[in-house]
């Protein structure tokens, strides 16, 4: 008998495969095209006719169509759409705080989820500059003359975003020696003024931190115990260094110790804190700073894990906004050099001046690392407090009482 002994099985297997594929295809076609019956369709739902026809090339209007202007418009429109989504998330978070719903920890999960979403969007916005950078400076120069006096500074949504997060008006860099709002007229100016008068995310987070459970002097009294432990720890550190026999090593360590001591003791000087607050070098109230530091130290406790995630997200947003500004500066420098901006500003030089801690909102959270101390210097929680932090449902200081302290 000639031929492959497995030929029959092979053909059978092939036919079976074809049959199975036919069945899969049949199942794939069992749906119903509901759109054919009328009603809302994809393009109408997203209003794509408006969006996809919102790219008017000024170079084309002037009779000299430049290809890369289309990319320039699309990229900036995408930025504005994402700014709108960030404002949507930010307003919802501010509303939760304003209505006091943040005391219910179930709502804290909403806050965390929405702030994380803002973080992810900002990461996308930072990366989006790479698309614009596929255009050369010469390509941009071909249509730049058609843009004036339009300028990125005129982005209403970005200014609203800065205000609602909590950028201090006193720390803003003047735009051509004028208040930033002077560059917006009519309704836009009113919207910006209104956003300045509303409670910022910074103020709402500050009030929330001031209620951190465990700060009460007649309760756990974290701050009082922490100060006591710091003084004791510094004294022990001083004696340890004093006992050293190597004079050179001893001198170096003593100099470092004095610096550390000055930094840590300043932490308990409320008047100095208020002075730095008045100068804009600190943003949070003294009690809010205590709450943030307590969350920082006890972040592994179940009660403080979610609050710590929020503080982390706030720092992430600050970091990403700084990166966004920096990438913007680099792109402008690359495209314009040191020429003036299309809106009349000094361009690169003005933008570079905004990449600083003046525009950081939660700078105090970054500075918490300054006060890191050995773990055994951090006050220990007694079993009652530890159990309470695990079982409490609401972040309200009234849940602590004096008989729960050491």
From Swiss-Prot:
Substrate binds at residues 72-76, 144, 342. GO terms for molecular function: amino acid binding; heme binding; identical protein binding; metal ion binding; oxygen binding; tryptophan 2,3-dioxygenase activity. Keywords: Dioxygenase, Heme, Iron, Metal-binding, Oxidoreductase, Phosphoprotein, Tryptophan catabolism. It catalyses: L-tryptophan + O2 = N-formyl-L-kynurenine. GO terms for biological process: L-tryptophan catabolic process to acetyl-CoA; L-tryptophan catabolic process to kynurenine; protein homotetramerization; response to nitroglycerin. It comes from the Eukaryota. Its EC number is 1.13.11.11. The modification Phosphoserine is found at residue 19. Pathway: Amino-acid degradation; L-tryptophan degradation via kynurenine pathway; L-kynurenine from L-tryptophan: step 1/2. Homotetramer. Dimer of dimers. Belongs to the tryptophan 2,3-dioxygenase family. Heme-dependent dioxygenase that catalyzes the oxidative cleavage of the L-tryptophan (L-Trp) pyrrole ring and converts L-tryptophan to N-formyl-L-kynurenine. Catalyzes the oxidative cleavage of the indole moiety. This is Tryptophan 2,3-dioxygenase. It comes from Mus musculus. The gene is Tdo2.
């Amino acid at each position: 008998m000639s031929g492959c002994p497995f030929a029959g099985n092979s053909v059978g297997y092939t036919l079976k495969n074809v049959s199975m594929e036919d069945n899969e295809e049949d199942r794939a076609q069992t749906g119903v095209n509901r759109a054919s019956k009328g009603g809302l369709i994809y393009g109408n739902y997203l209003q794509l006719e408006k969006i996809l026809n919102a790219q008017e090339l000024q170079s084309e209007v002037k009779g000299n169509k430049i290809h890369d202007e289309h990319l320039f418009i699309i990229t900036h429109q995408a930025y504005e759409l994402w700014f709108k989504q960030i404002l949507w998330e930010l307003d919802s978070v501010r509303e939760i705080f304003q209505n006091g719903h943040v005391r219910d920890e179930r709502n804290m999960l909403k806050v965390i989820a929405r702030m994380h979403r803002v973080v992810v969007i900002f990461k996308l916005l930072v990366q989006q500059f790479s698309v614009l950078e596929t255009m050369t400076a010469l390509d941009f120069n071909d249509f730049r003359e058609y843009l004036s006096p339009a300028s990125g500074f005129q982005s209403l949504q970005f200014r609203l975003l800065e205000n609602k997060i909590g950028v201090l008006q006193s720390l803003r860099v003047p735009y051509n020696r004028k208040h930033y709002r002077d560059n917006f007229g009519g309704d836009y100016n009113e919207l910006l003024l209104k956003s300045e008068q509303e409670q910022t995310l910074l103020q709402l987070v500050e009030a929330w931190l001031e209620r951190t459970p465990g700060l009460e002097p007649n309760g756990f009294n974290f701050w009082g115990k922490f100060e006591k432990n710091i003084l004791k720890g510094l004294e022990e550190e001083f004696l340890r260094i004093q006992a050293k026999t190597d004079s050179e090593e001893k001198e170096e360590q003593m100099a470092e110790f004095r610096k550390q001591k000055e930094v840590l003791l300043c932490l308990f000087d409320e008047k100095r804190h208020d002075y730095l607050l008045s100068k804009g070098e600190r943003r949070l109230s003294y009690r809010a700073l205590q709450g943030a530091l307590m969350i920082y130290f006890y972040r592994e406790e179940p009660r403080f894990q979610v609050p710590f995630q929020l503080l982390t997200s706030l720092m992430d947003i600050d970091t990403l906004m700084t990166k966004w500004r920096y990438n913007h500066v680099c792109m402008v420098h690359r495209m314009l050099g040191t020429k003036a901006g299309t809106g009349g500003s000094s361009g690169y030089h003005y933008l570079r001046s905004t990449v600083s801690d003046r525009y950081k909102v939660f700078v105090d959270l970054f500075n918490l690392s300054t006060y890191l101390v050995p773990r055994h210097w951090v006050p220990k929680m007694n079993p009652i407090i530890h159990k309470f932090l695990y079982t409490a449902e609401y972040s309200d200081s009234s849940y602590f009482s004096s008989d729960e302290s050491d």
